[in-house]
Amino acid sequence: MSKTAFSSPNHGERRLGPPDMIIIHYTGMETSAAARTRLCDPAAAVSAHYLIDVDGTIDQLVDEARRAWHAGVSEWDGETDINSRSIGIELVNKGAGSDYHPFPAAQMAALIDLITDIVARHDIAPKDVVGHEDIAPGRKIDPGPKFDWERLRRLGLATGPRLP
């Protein structure tokens, strides 16, 4: 698995120890360049640890030891500082718009490789690999109904989604 490093200034100290969750997002943008620009813009005050393009290219934007700013107002298992306990992965995808868009095979393969690697290094349970929609229901809808949760379940990487 090949990763390209970019540096987002939007991060801080983890407050709760090492990560024990993975949060999957979609960018809601047309291109990886547009998403990378936003995720690395200090004025935007948002970031993620990883950005995966439709061709499977993985960009690392924030070191895993740092707290990326991707979860916003959210909650999981009674904890509200999800950014401090998670690794955020953004998938380049237009999102809902007029219709949800599929996630290409190369992108899903790269995501599976990345999740497998992160889970092994941080001992993250499948129940804690979730979507943004799971930690911020009613506020967020990503990665949405076209995301292949069933594939992640079959591989033992996730148990989601939580929401219908």
Which residues make up each language-model segment?
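Short coil-to-beta-strand
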Residues: 80-91
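Basic/polar, cationic surfaces and motifs that engage anionic cell-wall
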Residues: 80, 94-164
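N-terminal catalytic cores of peptidoglycan-degrading enzymes
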Residues: 1-80
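Conserved, mostly hydrophobic/aromatic
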Residues: 24, 89, 111
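Structured loop/turn residues at beta-strand edges in well-structured enzyme cores
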Residues: 17, 84, 124
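Conserved beta-strand segments that form the floor/walls of ligand-binding pockets within enzyme
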Residues: 51, 88-90, 130
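Structural preference for beta-strand elements that scaffold enzyme active sites
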Residues: 21, 86-88, 128
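Residues immediately flanking
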Residues: 26, 91, 133
